[in-house]
Amino acid sequence: MPHQVRWLALASLILPAAVAAAPAYVAVPLGNLGGASIYGTGINARGQISGWADTDGSGAAHRHAFLYSDGVLTNLGTLAGGTQSFGYAINDAAQVAGSSNSGNTTSLHAVIFQGGTILDLNVFLGAQVSNAYAINAGGDAAGASRSGASFRAYRYSAAGNAITTLSTFGGTTSQAYGINVFGALAGFAHTDAEDAHAFRYTDGGGLVDLGTLGGRASIGYGIAPGGEVVGSAYLPGDLGPHAFIDDGTMHDIGTLGGGSSTAFSINAAGTIVGESTDAQGSSRAFVYASGAMVDLNTVTSGLGGSTLTTATAVNDAGQIVAMSCTGPLQCQQAYRLDPAPAAKVAAIEYHHAAFDHYFITAIPDEIAKLDSGVFAGWTRTGGSFNVYAADQVGAMPVCRFFSTTFAPKSSHFYTPDPRECAIVRANANWQLEGLVFNIPVPAADGACPANTAPVYRLYNNGVGAAPNHRYTTSLATRATMIAAGWIPEGYGPDAVGMCAPV
């Protein structure tokens, strides 16, 4: 959010909310660039997808990076004179991180495709070979480059075109595959025994070895705004590997009944996607949510007989990139999996007269307890707005927090902004209660998407030594609160915080 969260007072009023299980999906085929193979790699908040595809019958010799947007698959080309390019990740500005060769060399250079131009990151890396595997909202990229015998992970900072080169855990090689909004990285680095170990890198904490699940090796592929890393790691006896999530401790998230699995991507809600073998040893794409791994083939319509074998990316709206492949990187169909339309429910506003605090909820059990007086002192204001009860294309999950710092006064804080959510989570005074509903978000100028209404966010500036926020779709209510000294927070001149579906 443009306005940083003021550190509010939250007192525990309501039971933590459960995160919804994986929804059903509808498959949208991406098409091709004229060849037989296509591979999708990344997806942004708008549902645009990066990847690469064969452009003719020559196969890998003429694979080009692509951008899929609004039903159109666009060939992003190569550096001047090149024959190959690859797209590995995409941000909300439709910048695609990848690599390309050129007429001057057959070696690949890390690049960023942006608006019809190609930025050669090798100008700043000065390497023999380089790749850009990840990119964040600020245009910072991560990958690996080689100037001698071994690759080293790097981070490219768009501000100043600065390069940060990572070390290893005593071995020769490191590579970065993921970057989050704060510039934290995920990847792997070799130990002195030349075993690959997954890492998390932050400016404050440096390069942290995440270890394994008991075996010799692990790799990190994705990193969430909160710093959680996903990837794959070997079990004792080097069995596996199994997909993992590391939130400070590495957790095995299992398989679909087979011997191996890999997690490639995680979103702000903690939804994970990847691939796993099933009980018959066949590769299947999976989604992992609410503690359960689900075969995407069992919850997806519109596949036309194809079998999804891998899923490589998931955005915060729950849209997934998945492929049907016959071998490693030999994929004949790529899809965007859109969550089936979610039900709209009302978020009801309550007021506590003694505290002069406001609270909203869309959770039926909470509404029933508030209305029946189980939670004393709260009454309906008559205000409400619509939200989605589950993942919805074009909507973001909303984090809900509380803190006992200013008890007994009670307040809750809500944000659909992954960056803001991660900032609040990092503060020891706050507790994340859950992801309580999904809602569209405004553009930077405060404009809401079609068929939605602005939800204004207002802050009481700590009146009564217990800060509180109010969320309303009413311009009259907004004006009244501002006249009473409340401060508008959000996007654009009207400080819009969310956009309620109508």
Placement of each model-derived feature along the sequence:
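Compositionally biased, intrinsically disordered/low-complexity regions enriched for serine, proline
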Residues: 13, 20, 26, 233, ...
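A generic alpha-helix propensity feature with a strong bias for hydrophobic helices
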Residues: 5, 19, 26, 32, ...
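Generic secretory/membrane-interface signal
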Residues: 11, 16-17, 29, 69, ...
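Sec-dependent, cleavable N-terminal signal peptides
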Residues: 1-22
